[in-house]
Amino acid sequence: MRTVRRRELLGAAGAALALAAGTRARRAFGAEPVDLALVLAADVSRSINDDEFQLQRNGYAAAITSAAVLNAIGQGERRAIALCYNEWAGEGEEKVLLDWAVLRDKDSAQAFADKLLAQPRAYLGRTAIGSAIEFSMNLLAESGFDAPRHVIDVSGDGTSNQGDEVTATRDAAVAAGTTINGLAIFNKRAAALGGYLAAHTNPPGGIAKYYQTNVIGGPGAFVEQIDDFNSFGEAMIRKLVSEIACAEPAGDGAKAG
């Protein structure tokens, strides 16, 4: 992983300032009001095989359309959230699969999920978490919604091994008032292969600890951990409900330390 230079840090800081300024401007000029602007940033790096990827993708779709998530949206003051979905892998491998959409009911959630399931996998590369965060920050800056809360929801199964320094981009996002939460997946299959993959997917203290220390941050930030991709959908439901309601995670969640 390369070191972030001063120019890059200034770029991240500039994105943070633009995000904060853009939020104020949208509120001033009557942009569409929502309770939350949420970016789902999904790891599709090569440590995730095709079967695991499909479980992850299906889990996102199931969570978005779940009764629990729809109920959480309906309980908000504005009864709507803005949602954007991107997939990422190595540096420069970030792609918006579904641009911003407002979810306020079953039909809008189902339409989003159906479009998501129809998209092919974006990448199969390395793991650049910092670059994914910066990419997601830019999406928030350009979102065009009046949202009192901005959240980046990062899912992944390994440590960052390429691209921007994770903590630097995390700190820039937090400085802009953005919360970054994590869904850390312990990929037992990849870890059992040994060598680099074992170290990548099971770092000292575990992948959830890595996310807690390096990735998440901001008001109410937390990381949820799962031990296989089969439980991805259930974990994402818990995570989305907590993010939408701005509440404590109900499952195996750990706060930013």
Model regions: which residues?
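Short beta-strand-loop
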Residues: 76-115, 195-204, 208, 212
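Exposed acidic/Ser/Thr-rich ligand/metal-binding surfaces
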Residues: 126-176, 241, 257
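VWA/integrin I-like adhesion module and closely mimicked acidic/polar interface patches used
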Residues: 159-210
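C-terminal "exit" segments of structured domains
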Residues: 223-257
